Curated annotation (Swiss-Prot):
EC number assigned by the record: 3.1.6.-, 3.2.1.40
Region (Ulvan-active sulfatase): 22-568
Protein name (database record): Bifunctional sulfatase/alpha-L-rhamnosidase
Binding site for alpha-L-rhamnose: 764-766, 1058
Main location (coarse class): periplasm
Amino acid sequence: MIKYKAIINLVFIAVFFNNAMSQTVKKEKPNIIFILTDDQRFDAIGYAGNKFVNTPEMDKLAQQGTYFDHAIVTTPICAASRASLWTGLHERSHNFNFQTGNVREEYMNNAYPKLLKNNGYYTGFYGKYGVRYDNLESQFDEFESYDRNNRYKDKRGYYYKTINNDTVHLTRYTGQQAIDFIDKNATNTQPFMLSLSFSAPHAHDGAPEQYFWQTTTDALLQDTTLPGPDLADEKYFLAQPQAVRDGFNRLRWTWRYDDPEKYQHSLKGYYRMISGIDLEIKKIRDKLKEKGVDKNTVIIVMGDNGYFLGERQLAGKWLMYDNSIRVPLIVFDPRVNKHQDISEMVLNIDVTQTIADLAGVKAPESWQGKSLLPLVKQETSTISRDTILIEHLWDFENIPPSEGVRTEEWKYFRYVNDKTIEELYNIKKDPKEINNLIGKKKYQNVAKALREKLDELIAKNSDEFRAGPSDLTVELIRQPESEVKIFDLKPEFGWTVPLSSKYQSAYQLLVASSETIINANNGDVWDSGQVRSSQSTNVDFGGKPLKIGETYYWKVRIWDEENRLVDYSKAQKFTIGESDNYIISTENKFVTDKIKPSKFENRDGVYFIDFGKAAFATMEFNYQAKTPHTLTIRVGEMIDENGNVNRTPPAKSNIRYQELKVEVKPGQTRYRIPIQTDERNTRPNKAIPLPKGFPPLLPFRYAEIEGAQSSINANDVEQLAYHTFWDEKASSFKSDNNILNQVWDLSKYSIKATTFNGLYVDGDRERIPYEADAYLNQLSHYTTDREYAMARRTIEYFMKNPTWPTEWQQHVALLLYADYMYTGNTELVERYYEALKHKSLYELSNEDGLITSTKVDAEFMKKLGFPEGYKKPLTDIVDWPGANFNGSKTPGERDGFVFQPYNTVINSFFYENMKIMAQFAKILGKTDEVLDFELRAAKAKKAVNEQMFDKKRGIYVDGIGTDHASLHANMMPLAFGLVPQEHVDTVVEFVKSRGMACSVYGAQFLLDGLYNVGEADYALDLLASTSERSWYNMIRIGSTITLEAWDNKYKNNLDWNHAWGAVPANAIPRGLWGIKPKTAGFGIASIKPQMGKLKSSQITVPTVRGAIHATFTHNGPRSQTYEIEIPGNMVAEFSLDDIDGKDLIHNGQKVPAAFGAVQLSPGKHIIELKINSF
């Protein structure tokens, strides 16, 4: 019993304390009523001196409170202005208009009703909410959102709500909701915040009568003829830009004001509807007094935007004139009880800040207004604002967007879609804005200062969500501004969609003839207009063909996933050139890196220099000779056992070394070494010559200078390394395996270093493009940089310059397919489809669907692009080199492959070629050929598995007629998906038993095959191996660019600068991390990591749409974490092998295993793999 009484006492004390605290809170915090009207302009109130509108209650509030006679909305359109009021932000920030989706949650989380609701206020709303937002429950304790009913084209637009079964005008309905709200909540312990939004005096646009008022105001102005509008002469209309003359401002003028009868009806209706609101305000104030809360209830009255009442022969709002942006604003705080009129410019977004200040709630830092409470309480005479930003940014066909600034004396504005259309007014001397001073010499400095201020305020009030597209490309070329000539007269454009926009729903692309024109947002060469498309790569130029030799500028803007328009990108310059041969793919510029020594030593008068890495380069140095003499310069790729430049590289090898003489003399201080050209790699019509303007180049890392009579220091010497355009930051990789990290660095650098010659070449020995070399080079180039030009030009080169190996011809389809998948561009497919059909070798097939090179004749060689009289026949190669190559006693790189007329390697490539050709035929709309190539692929797969597979051993033999089984005969079917699932285990077991029994070229397909079937551990073992047949061996023997072979012993004429040895540069992103395009151009990315024994890894992979970033952490045997960031305008599918018995958790939510993959949208994702997480 005692316990029971104690509990009762505690409850009583708690209730009493809570009530006492609530009453204290209520006493400290006022009730707030914010009344918003629709289209009520600044002078449509009696207190402003208007004799025709009857607003006694508004006038009384103005007389008793603070009246702001220069209140301005930051944007003169109801939807955007209301969004500004809710969020406290300029339109430029919240970016909401009639055609967008919801206001961003990030902004609505800081909306003033939610802020007050979360800080002890009871919040209510009735009327026109005016913006799209689906969670009003989070803002209001009670609410009803409604507006004019646009289903009705008559008075029912305003008359469809009922009170006690009587249909009433919306103004009356809203007023009654306010009265009922006060009746229920005035005596509550919580203070209340009531937001009322009247639809009046907005016209009902769909109805011929336009304006509908209540009978209570019907008698007003009955016997009055209202005076006509100011600036009614047609010259004021004709002074408007064409877009305004053709737009909604003019159209709505014809609805309301274009004859005296319409004008009188509309203007009287407008005033009567305002008077109807005034009657409701009277009832509301009476109810406050009745409930005894009138002394502690602040009332704010404001219009959402201004309005044209026939001035300039216009109606509506939207423009930057004062008629459109100025509104009435009254703040009546009965606790102050001091009337004042304030002429300072104040904004709608100040009201948001003022409401928070009245409630004693700290305003979010993101809000952009200023509290007016210090002015209302007369604690200050100014809020210190000299210039305001005004804007109407909704890009709508019938209303031209504009932006400007206003001071007490000046107004400047311009039209967004043509910034050359500007207006400047001295509003102090010319308040009606009649005399446009723009272009007048006397006011040039004023206009310039205001333009700069506008740009400053635009930048200040733009946040991350305004960011425009970036990383612009023309013909897939980044930064084409200088040293690049675009060959396509109708080029394709591309850009990266900002991550803040997530997806693109539309774009507008401008091409202009000058920087001035593009900066004014004019596309005098081509304006795409708004194109409803998500395409952000390979966007075709749609104008007349561009002119050779001319320079152009372009930029683009997009609409995001919610149809919000963001800013234009920065403009990009490009120049049209002309190809000097049949190749149409634009060549990118070359870059020369000036590299200082990483080691510089004076060794008994011989200067030894280590530049850290080998490069295709020359060398320059500063030297001050006092007398003429000769310096001996040695450069090379190797050092000897004593750490000096190796003057005798291995016999037969193509490891480079040169000794050069440089004559020096007084008066000359800068010298370049005279590198000697090599006869073989400069053969006319065989080797690819260096680009025009290049000096002779040699791959070298080390140098020595002997014979110097004056001192030389490290800063005097530079290695000039030549390569194509390269972004080092485009890709990256790290893991907990140091060997793997070194292999990645070696491979990535190899791709950069070997791009010196304009096309992919096979190394310095020959400097000739080969199809297989190029394919491996391309894959690694595409996964290490967002650079496609060299690969595309090399593909075109092969169309007329084929090489002799059978499989190399089959690599051309692989090259084109990789380019298509990584870029999404079909230009080369369209141009070379017919020639590619020949290179796929489908004409060599037998009735079973297998091909043989023995069928090749001279006529077919011509089809492949070989010149008339070419002697060497098409020959199967499998791998390179063969046994006993070049006089050596080595087994070669073919694992003992036994050549047969019909062999497994050739037909594995053929199967892949047929699949690719079917896809290309589909792209080109060649339906019959799609079926033909699909059938050929199916027949080839069936025949290979029936005629080249040893069922007893469960492995593939080298060809029909032999029982020998090589690594190559088994890794190729694995790489191309030929192996039936029931035979994968035996094939994999055999492959693993052979080790790295293939060349650095074959390693591409070995790793592809292993990752295709989930052999992650073994693939990782190969990548991070330290054996003699490994990439680490290349590092160990001293090279910084990948070798042509695993070691000199396996190919005695090898060079130390062969990109086909850089397979890990693509195997790590494509295999270990499993990041590939699932659809062309990375519209959908596939991410299927196979980390094997790694404990941690992070990677950046470039794509045509932006970089994919990923991190892996092995937290322990029961938990792994992947963090993935997907760029804008891309989706990805993330999957893992063997997730049975494990939980996949995406951003905290468990993913049903049946889905098989996690769908990733643009942005950051955390994916956890947990074992038995229950």
